[in-house]
């Protein structure tokens, strides 16, 4: 059984980009779909989709490259099952002075730090992307 599916997702993306893969496939969950949606909205991936039936559902993420280089230079897990990191709306981090994003899980769903600030929401900091 997988201990931390979010870390697994981020590692799969990082490894796929290291070998310049076009797509990366992983087991699907609602949280992973929400994270993929934020990555797409912020322009870090081209697209994502679901494949398979309900028992073997897969999430397929199409990675984005610019002039042969990955658009994501760093993707790092912040909160983990052993140490969850929560920030209030006033404490939300700015990643790389606003050039990157933090993905936050709030009571209103998973969103970027910019959107959480706009809505006045705090929550669990899942990961940093730049």
UniProtKB/Swiss-Prot annotation:
Highest taxon above the source species: Bacteria
Gene Ontology CC, one term: ribonucleoprotein complex
GO BP, one annotated term: translation
KW Thylakoid (keyword) present: no
Record keyword Ribonucleoprotein present: yes
An MF annotation (GO) of this entry: rRNA binding
Keywords: Ribonucleoprotein, Ribosomal protein, RNA-binding, rRNA-binding
Quaternary structure and interacting proteins, as annotated: Part of the 30S ribosomal subunit. Contacts proteins S5 and S12.
Chain's role: One of the primary rRNA binding proteins, it binds directly to 16S rRNA central domain where it helps coordinate assembly of the platform of the 30S subunit.
HAMAP family, sorted: Ribosomal_uS8_B
Family to which the UniProt record says this protein belongs: Belongs to the universal ribosomal protein uS8 family.
Protein name according to UniProt: Small ribosomal subunit protein uS8
């Amino acid at each position: 059984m997988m201990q931390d599916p979010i870390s697994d997702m981020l590692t799969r993306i990082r490894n796929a980009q290291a070998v310049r893969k076009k797509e990366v496939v992983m087991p699907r969950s609602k949280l992973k779909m929400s994270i993929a949606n934020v990555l797409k909205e912020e322009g870090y991936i081209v697209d994502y989709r679901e494949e398979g039936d309900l028992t073997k559902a897969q999430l397929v993420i199409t990675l984005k490259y610019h002039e042969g280089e990955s658009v994501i230079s760093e993707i790092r897990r912040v909160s983990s099952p052993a140490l969850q990191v929560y920030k209030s709306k006033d404490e939300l981090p700015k990643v790389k002075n606003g050039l990157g994003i933090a993905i936050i899980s709030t009571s209103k769903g998973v969103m970027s730090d910019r959107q959480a600030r706009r809505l006045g929401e705090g929550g669990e900091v899942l990961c940093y992307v730049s």
